Regions:
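ATP-dependent carboxylate activation and anion-phosphoryl transfer catalytic cores
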Residues: 1-167
Length: 167
């Protein structure tokens, strides 16, 4: 069994480090077919890699086709974010699974967890004005020094809260 707490959508183009990208939960621009493909692929990866615990999968979508960027069988900086916005205690569940418990015995189903009734936007924080001489061009190397979270009933308001919080 596997549980996907939620799917986040990166706003910036592919190639920008995910830590430097604005991310939104739930994803705003994916079709149901694309979501179904991601859930299917993620389940296959988890089974084939014999994952017990956490796995982070990053996808890119172009013209309706889903591409795998990377599969990381470990925790990442997205774990506290997605745990917070979905209410799914990922670290606790992962540890309990590693100790032999089943997701279903802990009250969780398998597959994609239902979306929360709000939108959450993670906005990176940059300290370029304090770090002189730092390359400010976005790319695969992370430049942000923190992040904030905006939560609201819709994307516009959640993004606005995040941008205000990021300064």
């Amino acid at each position: 069994n596997f549980l996907i707490p939620g799917i986040m959508e990166q706003v910036e183009r592919t190639g920008v480090h995910s830590g430097d990208s604005i991310c939104v939960y739930p994803a705003q621009h994916l079709t149901q077919a694309e979501i179904d493909t991601m859930v299917d692929y993620t389940g296959r990866f988890a089974r084939e890699l014999h994952v017990t615990g956490l796995v982070n999968v990053q996808y890119a979508v172009s013209n309706g086709k889903v591409y795998v960027i990377e599969v990381n069988p470990r925790s990442s900086r997205t774990v506290p974010y997605i745990s917070k916005v979905t209410g799914v205690p990922m670290v606790d569940l992962a540890v309990r699974c590693c100790l032999g418990e089943k997701l279903t015995d802990m009250g969780y189903g398998t597959g994609l967890h239902p979306n929360a009734p709000y939108v959450a936007v993670k906005v990176p924080v940059f300290s370029f004005e304090k770090l002189h001489g730092v390359d400010t061009q976005f790319g695969p190397e992370m430049k942000s020094t923190g992040e904030v979270l905006g939560i609201a009933p819709n994307f516009h308001d959640a993004l606005l809260k995040g941008l205000i919080g990021a300064g």
